Amino acid sequence: MLACLTRGNLLDVLQEGFNEQQLQAYVAWVNAQLKKRPAVKPVQDLRQDLRDGVILAYLIEIVAGEKLSGVQLSPGNQQEMKNNVEKVLQFVASKKIRMHQTSAKDIVDGNLKSIMRLVLALAAHFKPGSSRTVNQGRDSRAPLQSHRPHCATAVAQGAAAALADVCHDMSRSGRDVFRYRQRNSSMDEEIENPYWSVRALVQQYEGQQRSPSESSCSSLTSPSPIHSAKSESIITQSEEKADFVIIPAEGIENRTEGTDSPLSRDWRPGSPGTYLETSWEEQLLEQQEYLEKEMEEAKKMISGLQALLLNGSLPEDEQERPLALCEPGVNPEEQLIIIQSRLDQSMEENQDLKKELLKCKQEARNLQGIKDALQQRLTQQDTSVLQLKQELLRANMDKDELHNQNVDLQRKLDERNRLLGEYKKELGQKDRLLQQHQAKLEEALRKLSDVSYHQVDLERELEHKDVLLAHCMKREADEATNYNSHNSQSNGFLLPTAGKGATSVSNRGTSDLQLVRDALRSLRNSFSGHDPQHHTIDSLEQGISSLMERLHVMETQKKQERKVRVKSPRTQVGSEYRESWPPNSKLPHSQSSPTVSSTCTKVLYFTDRSLTPFMVNIPKRLEEVTLKDFKAAIDREGNHRYHFKALDPEFGTVKEEIFHDDDAIPGWEGKIVAWVEEDHGEN
């Protein structure tokens, strides 16, 4: 970088403690580069001329050989100026140029420190070859230095002077820490080893041995290394006022960032606050730490001086041959003092080695503790990993179980869907069957309505027959009257004309009854075997049978009245009517026994082979008749089922089936109505 910065003025840049000479040096270097572009005006003020970014873009184009694109050569507002500076900073970042953190806003606002940092970074990165190093400057100015000491006494006196100068600097550091740090930083930039002054003395001593022609010993005129360094720095500054010396950027960064002083830490970019803003307590603590560090360095310097005085070399330098305890021609008291000093030096070194050993042991214990802690932490982490693996295994097992459950549920869902489809099909079939049955029911209702109409016709015909029967009975009464009046003339027989009329009436009644039976048979065949309309047909058939029975009873009574007087030819009609009843009954039927006593029970039963009911009389009271008596009365072979008409208090008229022979048979209106069906063993 610039020569003024290489001799301790970098802290001035960091602290903005600029002087006019430094600013002019920066301006001169920038103008020297801009002379390569005659069209560009030279720079007068760094704050004003570089804040728009145009001069910086020209400077990059000159020193780097690359032209920045998108730069506004005549920015009209702050935003365009900021954009130009941001492009410059982006170029610096893309080239990986080492520079303290700088923002575009600082440069646009005219922050001189940020501008000088940027110029410093560009000069250090792109113009390192044109500079002269500090060491070369020293070599060129070597003849200007003072003469070297020529004996060990002069070396000791020079070391004492250097030690006194260091103590004086340390005493001044407590009063003015900033000035001391500036001096210390200027010295550290040249020589970084704490034994730099001692090494300078050793080099002078060795130079004296290499040049034996210089034999004079002058201790009072030999300057201290510190003053020599100071004078050298002053000479360097005076020589380089008109020239610019660029050093590598790595050295600048190492000196500015690698320093351990609190001042450099306070002024590091990005810190929360500056050194001037810290409280006085923190300043005192920092000064105390810094003084302790300086004391340690002073102790090391004293030890090095003592070793130099006693052994003729530094402690860290390797000695090829051991030194003798006593030198010839030396006073014994001086030898004793030297030996005592060596013993003290050895004891001091022994104490230092012990301290180093204790420190190493403490570090070893700390490392062992850290190792144990890390081992314990590793064990805990292994345990945690095992637990996580177990949890992962359990999670995988749960996942597999859930997957299996999902598969089972999916299978059940498919089965349910299949059953649902089958149920839908069955429901559709049942709907079709229901529609068919509904159609059949409508057809049956239509037929039933026809039957009801036919029944009405039959009832009308029956009423007509009743009228005819009444008319016939009236005629019979008239004939009986005529018979009584002509009994002597007819000799107990009716007139032939009367007999012919009765016969015609009986034949007509038989034909009407046969017509009713045929109609009921055809109506029964139109229904299925378990149709509920059979009950209606049975009731109708029972009513007709009861009506015929009453007619038969009336006819029988009339015949009994006439039997005493004359045998009427109309008995032949009655015998023809009785032929429809079963002749194989053991008990006398109602047709063969005209008079039924109160001890007999009339039984009317139907069979599945004939639509015409059968009637028998059982010589027992109604409540005493059992199933065994009924079976003996009808006398039918094979297995049969017996149903009897009964009155249920809840459902009304029902058919009750009797199984046991000893069970009593229910009655219906003073008689027994039964249905006998053959049992084929299906149920």
From Swiss-Prot:
This is Dixin. Residues 211-228 have a biased composition (Low complexity). One of its GO terms (cellular component) is stress fiber. The modification Phosphoserine is found at S186, S231, S590. Keywords: Actin-binding, Cell junction, Coiled coil, Cytoplasm, Cytoskeleton, Developmental protein, Lipoprotein, Myristate, Phosphoprotein, Ubl conjugation, Wnt signaling pathway. Residues 207-235, 482-509, 556-594 are annotated as: Disordered. Residues 482-492 have a biased composition (Polar residues). Isoform 1 but not isoform 2 binds filamentous actin. Interacts with the complex composed of DVL2 and Rac. Interacts with AXIN1; competes with MAP3K1. Interacts with MAP3K4 preventing MAP3K4 interaction with AXIN1. Directly interacts (via DIX domain) with DVL2 (via DIX domain). Interacts with gamma-tubulin. Changing D648A: Loss of interaction with DVL2. Abolishes activation of Wnt signaling. It comes from Homo sapiens (Human). Residues 279-452 form a coiled coil.
